[in-house]
Each structure stands twice: as structure tokens, then as C-alpha cells.
């Protein structure tokens, strides 16, 4: 199960945070700080999986953004690594080469995309085409 998803820049500013387990506000800030500290200084030749408390964080860096997913210790790392890539591909489709400012100014759309393929902390949809079609239908309604 996914515990949380964080999108952070190199400076540690959180651009998107989605929690699937209840945490106090102070604990969320602490988690965001710790995850950033874990991933920002890791060498590129290391794996994209790192243990975090009693869970593990799977992360991927795209340009200046770190996409981090915290999951149970027994979950499949590669499935979540690919889901991060799927998320970025879908963002690229909607924002034509997504950048940090797209996430800041269109956060509502980013959350909608995320909700299309992750439900209650579990991967629900892995088809890029299906997600893009659903998002296109939602855009027609607006």
C-alpha cells in the first residue's frame, strides 16, 4: 500500500503531497524533510529504493523534481518505479513537457490525474490511454 506521494524540488519545497494514511500536520512536515534529505544527496549510481522507518521510499528524479512514493516494505519496488514514470508521461501529455511551474499553477489537474490511477493507496489503473481518455472527458465537462 502507498503511504504517501511527494513531489519535491532540489531545495526541498514540496510541490505536491498526497497522504493515504492519517498523519498530524507536524508529522507531515517532518516526513517531507526526512524524505528530501534521503533522496537529494543520493548518488545517481545507487538504486532508487531506500528504507525509510518501517517502510521504503521509491523515488525518481526528473529534471529538478524528485517524485517519491513511500510504500510497505513488502511491496514491489519496480511496479511503483514504473508508476512514477507513468505519472510523468501523463503529465507530459497534458502539459507538453511538464515543469515545476505547471505543477504549482495547475495543482488541481495534477491531483485529478493522480486520483485517476491511485485509489486509497493502491494502484488501480495502469493504462496510459485509459487515464488520458478519462481526463479528456473531464476536461470536456469544464
From Swiss-Prot:
Gene Ontology terms: biological process: clathrin-dependent endocytosis; protein transport
Keywords tagged on the record: Cell membrane, Coated pit, Endocytosis, Membrane, Protein transport, Transport
Primary localisation category: membrane
Family annotation (Gene3D superfamilies): 3.30.450.60
Domain of life, source organism: Eukaryota
Molecular function in Gene Ontology: clathrin adaptor activity
Subcellular location, record wording: Cell membrane; Membrane, Coated pit
SUPFAM superfamilies reported for this sequence: SNARE-like
Protein's UniProt keywords contain Transmembrane: no
InterPro entries noted in UniProt: AP_complex_ssu, AP_mu_sigma_su, APS2, Longin-like_dom_sf
Entry GO terms, CC: AP-2 adaptor complex; nucleus
Topology versus the membrane: Peripheral membrane protein
Function: Subunit of the adaptor protein complex 2 (AP-2). Adaptor protein complexes function in protein transport via transport vesicles in different membrane traffic pathways. Adaptor protein complexes are vesicle coat components and appear to be involved in cargo selection and vesicle formation. AP-2 is involved in clathrin-dependent endocytosis in which cargo proteins are incorporated into vesicles surrounded by clathrin (clathrin-coated vesicles, CCVs) which are destined for fusion with the early endosome. The complex binds polyphosphoinositides.
Family assignment from sequence similarity: Belongs to the adaptor complexes small subunit family.
Subunit structure: Adaptor protein complex 2 (AP-2) is a heterotetramer composed of two large adaptins (alpha-type and beta-type subunits), a medium adaptin (mu-type subunit) and a small adaptin (sigma-type subunit).
Protein name: AP-2 complex subunit sigma
Organism expressing this protein natively: Arabidopsis thaliana (Mouse-ear cress)
Lineage summary: Eukaryota, Viridiplantae, Streptophyta, Embryophyta, Tracheophyta
Amino acid at each position: 500500500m502507498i503511504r504517501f506521494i511527494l513531489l519535491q524540488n532540489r531545495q526541498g519545497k514540496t510541490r505536491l503531497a498526497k497522504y493515504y494514511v492519517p498523519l498530524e500536520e507536524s508529522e507531515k512536515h517532518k516526513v517531507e524533510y526526512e524524505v528530501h534529505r534521503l533522496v537529494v544527496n543520493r548518488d545517481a549510481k545507487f538504486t532508487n529504493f531506500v528504507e525509510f522507518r518501517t517502510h521504503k521510499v521509491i523515488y525518481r528524479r526528473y529534471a529538478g523534481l524528485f517524485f517519491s512514493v513511500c510504500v510497505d516494505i513488502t511491496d514491489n519496488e519496480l511496479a511503483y518505479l514504473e508508476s512514477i514514470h507513468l505519472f510523468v508521461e501523463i503529465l507530459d501529455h497534458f502539459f507538453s513537457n511538464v515543469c515545476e511551474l505547471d505543477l504549482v499553477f495547475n495543482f488541481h489537474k495534477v491531483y485529478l490525474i493522480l486520483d485517476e490511477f491511485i485509489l486509497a493507496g493502491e494502484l488501480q489503473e495502469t493504462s496510459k490511454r485509459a487515464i488520458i481518455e478519462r481526463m479528456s472527458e473531464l476536461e470536456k465537462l469544464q
